[in-house]
Amino acid sequence: MDQSQKTVLRTITIIGGSLSLASTIIAFILFWFFKENRSFTFEIQMYLTFSIFLYSLSSLLPYEIESVWCSIQSYLLNTSLTSLSIWSTIMGYSCLISMIHKTHLEQHKKFYRIVFLSTAFAFPLVLSSVILFTKIYGDSNGICWIDVGTEYKVRFIFKMVMMFYLIDWYIIIVNVFFILKIFLMNRRSHQNKNELYAYIKWYPIVNVVCEVIATINRINGLFNGEKITFILSIIQVIFDSFEGLVFVCIFLFSPGISQSVIVFCRRIFNRKNEISTSNSMATGDNSISDDNALFKVNNEESDFTKKIEEDYGLGI
């Protein structure tokens, strides 16, 4: 692949990484601001968002081959990608187990927190550290990851499968199982058809789509050697770079966050109207009307929080 093609891939990576990084910051702000919506499911989403943050940050690091930056970028990229895929699987599992028993995760969240963090953070860190000693990190066409100069040589295929792709393909299979199971359970039970499962199921779906596209490109590379198809590489980079952004968008449009933002904006709007009316009107009728409007909005916020807790059992 020539330098101009690498530049195109690098540009797409930077654009996707920048948008993902900005969206993760917004997600962290909302997590801090809307404390009343926090739940264990919300907490899991924040862990996944942190993986996206690491991936976005690593994709924006300097692209300098044979430098310390290349090793750092490769390490963070491999860690965050593996972690992100595992968290998508955890979201699918959380959705499935919650459809069977709504309060199960909340009741055993201490146990699940240890298991999830060990699986989705500790394991990728150890795996990426092991790969460091194999000396296969390097130029991966526009970014530092697994060196494309050695990736498709026979002696490295086993290492690649064992250290990354085998895990990646296993995650794809598990996510497909969760997706099919969730759809089947939704069809059989009208009780489970609510907004919570409608948006959580998209985490494993998005991950499967992105990983399948990456797999197609890798298999194509195995057959064609180092003559990687540029179009396939562009498609893979687009899906890889924007996967994190899509995950954050799913989170931002989730029932708890989107409704909380709407209610908050209504409160601000009604308070401004209240101040404006009280300053311009001498009578108290409009003031009473505005107080009632504000009281109504506050009730909407309270009712919404209660509805999330009662209907979904998991908050958001």
Positions of predicted regions on the chain:
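First transmembrane helix
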Residues: 7-36, 49, 53, 93, ...
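Intracellular signaling interfaces of 7-transmembrane GPCRs
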Residues: 36-40, 97-112, 176-199, 253-283
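Non-transmembrane, juxtamembrane loop and terminal tail segments
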Residues: 259-316
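Seventh transmembrane helix
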Residues: 202-203, 208-210, 215-218, 229-279
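Extracellular TM2-ECL1-early TM3 structural module of rhodopsin-like
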Residues: 10, 51-94, 98, 104-105
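Class A (rhodopsin-like) GPCR signature focused on the TM5-ICL3 interface and adjacent 7TM helical core
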Residues: 89-90, 96, 162-191, 201-217, ...
